[in-house]
């Protein structure tokens, strides 16, 4: 019966130029349930929630609240109906205080005067009630990412929202913060609030959701009760085939030192402090060393220094016995360094180039692709076609496809094909599976392990602890620019890593 559902999205269709992001999708949310929305990258999850929150208008379909059809033209309409949303990328004003962010747009006033004391009282009461402790006077720019998420949740609660949308809420949290968020969601559920939870993490769905709706390529695949399903079944619904969720790999056989990093320090002019502090470690041939940590703790800057995108303030980098501290990016590439960058659009691809031109970005100047100073298009096409076939890169027009038109997963496959085919001595893979579906993740993990088994030294930088534990032979944790601990994945736990990632421990000692 319709009255069983607090929200119904019936036969929703939303189109963008050239793509049907939502194709006749129905989603029904019960009062007091946690309902997960699962799908691969580009399946239409965020689009569907943006329709519910009033950011997009659908071409077809209707939305009902408590059985009555409603029109949601913008986020103000959504808020008026008790619908709130925590976006994947937080919508906070960094130079405002926590309190100012929470009340922004709904400031209480009397006779035209802001009643901040009244607002503070309500915020602190909500903070206490739900265990979302925050400092209302702290600037958002000075608080952690986990704390910023609490501010976003309090923004919803301050507006008395009863239907709460969380878009990939755990992407930037430590394991402990993820556990806290799950408890907060369970608390909301007990209160009778209804939660829509967008995620691609099957463990979290199994832990907290009551039901799960699965989307694939913009279409509705079905809704299942979590108590009656498995992770394997959900992944099969999501990608249309069986997926290997665990990485199968033999124990590492480390060889000679390939990467030697000694006392590397980098300075951030923006923050006016050191972003990387005296980092020293080695990576051997035939092993995967993972640099783990919460986003914003110096990993990005360190990789920039390692790959030549930024200069070091101090320290030395040696690649296979050769000092490359001051080498150019091209020289590092010639010396055997391959780099799968964190931001595939900014540093990995030229989006308006064809796929074949992107495939030779690291090689176009080599003799095999040149004749008399001109690039040989036939050789470029031949090389690109081979990589496309070998690495299963799917695109509309093959080698001539403009890269911008390709899916995120296939863009990433193209980068991996280009970087691995160069037969590197060192492969630096930075968040190689970020934003990808389980099928693409499975493929990329297999490629990284295969490189290790060929004798390549692999430095993996990842925020995903499941990925870290699955792939790494050794784990280094970075906190505030320092390596604060080294671990063997066989003898550590996600919880222990989380303590080091949050700065609670350093080199085996408790910190304050």
Predicted regions and their residues:
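Glycine-rich phosphate-binding loops of nucleotide-dependent enzymes
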Residues: 2-512
